[in-house]
Amino acid sequence: MHGQNYVAQMNKPGLPPFLTVQSGGVSLAVKLQPRASTNEIVAQREFGAELRIKVTAPPVDAAANEALIRLLAERFDCPRSAVQLVRGHTSRHKIIKLHGFSADDVLAKLANK
């Protein structure tokens, strides 16, 4: 099942479509752009069904996935072990679980660059 459908089924009212509350944390639906010029979470006025994230690493030997996990761990000031790639290991469309975070925590961290 595609990441967007997964989020739509599990999302609670009032949250951005890319964010899903789960037991023990939250999940993010992410569209990853490898081989970008910078590592960044793309700022958007209105978030879509997926959070767009760019990494400089190529999509080879899981390098882009590792860069994604590092970037999210830095942004959310947590250990890399708290960031789990749940689905989409070989796709640009991914589901990431952030263990120990609330939806409010995530939205606050995304708002503060």
What does each model-found stretch correspond to?
Residues 75:
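C-terminal catalytic core of tyrosine-transesterase DNA break-rejoin enzymes
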